[in-house]
Amino acid sequence: MITNKKKFFTEILKGILKLVVAGIFIGFFKEYDFWIALILAAKIFHNIYKDIIRPKNKNWLLLVGMLLTCFGGIVGETWGVANGYWEYHKVTRALPLWLPFAWILAFHYLYKLELKLIPLLKNKSQKNKIFLALLLALILPAFGEIITIYLGVWTYYWPYQLFGVPLYAFICLVFVHMLVYTILHFICKKYKINDVVFN
């Protein structure tokens, strides 16, 4: 299934390392949500310039995916906190200011990782791409959550937890990411956009 296993797993390990660094950063500075938001916003503007504005072929699909993920994520966060399913700590508001930026970066992170991993698949069929997307959306965001949960950023109150992350949260994370991926797939199909990840 994989042409170069060493490179494939090296990219995944590099991705996990990025999550660890981000999780520790948010965990240690959780009470300074404004400053975290500012730093994450700067990172987003850097990514937009580097990946969308500067290149000759503009990848507007990436920006659409980032905005859709942000919208879906914040709707879910608002619903979850309002219903008492989880709670953020050490902030003066229900939702920390950095949250929308974290959702935007989550899409960018998964998309860029898939861009590196898909060329390493022997069979680049839609089925294999979907399987890879499901696997990454199931494992990696939850891995980042485990770190921040253990550093006291938030607490889930749902049952059936694995390292502080409940089964329902795994399902919600996959749902948001796969819904965005499905929308982007149909955008690519309708407007005949050639994208390694979505078609």
Task: Name these PLM-found stretches.
Residues 1-199:
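Aromatic-rich, lipid-facing transmembrane alpha helices and their immediate juxtamembrane interface loops
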